[in-house]
Amino acid sequence: MNLIQELEKEQFDKLSAGKVIPEFGPGDTVIVNVKVVEGERSRVQAYEGVCIGRSGGGINESFTVRKISYGEGVERVFPLLSPMIDSIKVVRRGKVRRAKLYYLRDLRGKSARIVEKKQDRPAKVVAGAAE
């Protein structure tokens, strides 16, 4: 590894220490708990929406979350390793065939829904079939 890769790996390890980052991707509904500082007080605010894309890699990776608030579409970009992110929770997995879901910006109502990904079930074992 060259020097830049070593420095990035050190930073990545330092920033991700103690953080649990679940695996999620475009189409997944996530709740991002964000630390908000108002004056001297600090609180945690939940931001729930659909992940419409991830970009970058390593310490520069970020993801975009879209939600509808009071009839208006709101998108927010979060750096994955930001110290302002308290936690990330995946609520449901979406079945999509694109890496970037920017087409959701033009859709409203039922057409903007994303089908939930079905859980893979283990194969049924038929008694005596293997013999």
From Swiss-Prot:
Signal peptide: none annotated. PROSITE patterns: RIBOSOMAL_L19 (PS01015). It holds the Pfam family Ribosomal_L19. GO terms for cellular component: cytosolic large ribosomal subunit. GO terms for molecular function: structural constituent of ribosome. Keywords: Ribonucleoprotein, Ribosomal protein. GO terms for biological process: translation. This protein is located at the 30S-50S ribosomal subunit interface and may play a role in the structure and function of the aminoacyl-tRNA binding site. Belongs to the bacterial ribosomal protein bL19 family. HAMAP family: Ribosomal_bL19 (MF_00402). This is Large ribosomal subunit protein bL19. It comes from Rhodopseudomonas palustris (strain BisB18). The lineage of its organism: Bacteria, Pseudomonadati, Pseudomonadota, Alphaproteobacteria, Hyphomicrobiales.
